[in-house]
């Protein structure tokens, strides 16, 4: 096992694997590093403007968040921005996009200081659904230094590992969802297809699932109870 101490002038943030390298962001240092995965030596560095929060690789681009509602898609060789999308919920920007995990055309992310994981369409930026693992996170602390802040896809099981700042455990969960029938849609009075989230915990822990559908646009707050 290799252990590398990072430069104390940098606050290390999100990382992702790219081929035989690890790409690591710095929070306010405006630097990203390419690190050899075999020995953790720095082989290249990139400059960027703004803050670095989360990063993942979707097979074509490095996908990066900066704590706003914007997500940038960057060239994996040069780190130059190819294009950006804005994350929205019912047409309203969702700020504080943090940790990212790319799975196919979907981007999973946590929203800083909100106890949720959201699914983002990588083309439109629309939030497709979200889940709130409060039954897990509530056992790990409730202050700003103990928030949900880690998502990793487990290809072998199809599940997701989640954890948070200063958490003592990581948890393997499975997330799936399905659309409701038109009959349910009509009786509920909703004017668009809604989604029911079905989630099961592989480690035999309950995971609270929250479904929310709004008719009136407002600043997104995923801690609100469903209307």
PLM segments and residue spans:
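Conserved small/polar residues in nucleotide/adenosyl-binding loops
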Residues: 1-6
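Loop/turn-rich, solvent-exposed surfaces of beta-rich toroidal or solenoidal domains
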Residues: 92-124
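Blade-level signature of beta-propeller repeat domains, shared across WD40, Kelch, NHL, RCC1
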Residues: 150-184
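Short loop/turn segments that connect beta-strands within beta-propeller blades
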Residues: 36-40, 75-79, 121-125, 174-178
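Secretory targeting signatures
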Residues: 100, 181-227
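Beta-rich, blade/repeat-based domains predominating
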Residues: 8-19, 48-65, 91-105, 137-157
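Conserved beta-strand positions in repeat-built beta-propeller and related beta-rich domains
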Residues: 24-29, 62-69, 109-113, 162-166
